[in-house]
Amino acid sequence: LIRRHCIALGLLAALAGFFPALAAQPGSRSPTVLVVGDSLSAEYGLKRGTGWVALMERRMAQEKIAAQVINASISGDTTSGGRSRLVALLKQHKPNLVIIELGANDALRGLPLPMTQDNLQAMTLAAQESGAKVLLIGMQMPPNYGQDYGARFAALYATVAKVNKAALVPFLLKDVADGPDSARLFQNDRIHPNEAAHPLILNNVWPAVKKLIA
């Protein structure tokens, strides 16, 4: 009996060596995705679990992608606020992917565009230096901000992404703010997308996320 037990153990060990993917990897863990955003990612005015970040987590489960999602988004946050708390978040969660969705509140408050770009640059660099990949989520301003301002605001995301070779989603609210059904996709404040809009938002983000964590 002892001899049979030893033979069985030896066979299992041999199989584990022959099929390394089946063997446990010491110290391995599921990838962590850290989302640092504002109210557009923090489920402002929504029923809990209906925002695009929660929907992304469910999509991962459906597609059998074992990843942990940390949503560190805060309503009203600016790029300065995100920058000030990112280092601590990186140390705490050690993410494999950092999604940065900030900047809209900078524009709403009339903050200088160079400052917004500098903050996004610093956040991207800090995340990359920690070993994480970065996905920048861009925003666009309504026409009443002026064509020149809108173009410069949108361009800063592309600039930061290009300089740092980071991934980019050019416009989080594509097909939401600029679609034919935009009137029914916003809350009463006409600023924040409603529950019906968030599956569309996820459609904008998911292809890039999947590529980065696959």
Predicted regions: what they are:
Residues G76-S80:
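N-terminal helical cap/lid subdomain that shapes the substrate entry/recognition surface
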Residues A16-A21:
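C-terminal segment of classical bacterial N-terminal signal peptides
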Residues R3-H5, S30, N96:
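A detector of low-complexity, intrinsically disordered, Ser/Thr/Gly/Pro/Ala-rich segments
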Residues A61, I65, G81-A214:
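Alpha-helical cap/lid subdomain in secreted, periplasmic
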Residues A23-S75, R85-K94:
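Serine-esterase "nucleophile elbow" of acetyl-processing enzymes
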Residues L1-L11:
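N-terminal export leaders
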